[in-house]
Amino acid sequence: MYFTRDPVIETVITSREGYKLSVRNTKHFSQDPFMVEAIEVISLGNICFFRNCDHSKPFLVPAGDYEVMEVRDTKINLKAVGLDRGVKIAGGREALIKLTKSTPLPVIDEKPLADSPEEGTEPTSPSKKEKKEARKDSFKGEKWKEKKKLSRRRNHKEIAEVTGASQEILDTVKEELWEESQENEIVEQKKFSLLPPPAKLISEVISQTVVDPVVTSADLNESLQALVRESSDLINALLSADDAIHFPETEEEPTSASFEESSAMFFPETSSATEEE
């Protein structure tokens, strides 16, 4: 860090051998402390700060919020041991031969020999136990294998039953679908048989029914003329009859002329046709 005015170094705190200085925050104990070997106490105006003497790890903290403690260093200084490469074995082969000659022969006691058969019997017991354990293990293994086989057979049977049931269900569903399809085909055939296609088109029928208006008017004129003739014939026949027909005074006798006039009023076309004749 650079300052416009260098601070005043009040004092320098250093640790003893095997110790270090721990600068810890008194307000926040969760913060890790600074472990250093020496600290400078500097002042900027009326405020004091702790500054690390080691410039590779600099820090500047207020002295009022931090405390300095001397803690034993956990590091162990190991000294390097130098290896002496010029070590030689004294005597060489001759020393080894002398050692073999000077060594006394071992004395065999009788007691250990007497105790040897007892010791020999002891290993037999573990062998029997091992055999029994091996038999038990084999028996357990056989039982386990049999159980496994039985479980496999049961699983195969259950799978076969399930597949058989599913196959039956599929067969029944297929049969029902086939029957429904057959019924639908029969119904469709009946519908087609009940409703045969028309022999003529609708346009042809309409064209046949349409008649010229001139022809219809001529037919109507002819029919009206025929009715007028028939009515006039009937009136003449009634007038020419021997029996006189007496009508009331209020009523007037109808004449052929009046009937013709009335018909002409109601049917002008017929009257014009009669005049032309």
Curated annotation (Swiss-Prot):
Biased composition (Low complexity): 256-267
Disulfide bonds: none
Superkingdom, taxonomy of origin: Bacteria
Biased composition (Basic and acidic residues): 127-145
Region (Disordered), start-end ranges: 107-157, 245-277
Biased composition (Basic residues): 146-156
Entry-linked InterPro entries: GrgA_tf (IPR054977)
Homology family: Belongs to the chlamydial CPn_0623/CT_504/TC_0791 family.
Record-given protein name: Uncharacterized protein CPn_0623/CP_0124/CPj0623/CpB0649
Species this chain originates from: Chlamydia pneumoniae (Chlamydophila pneumoniae)
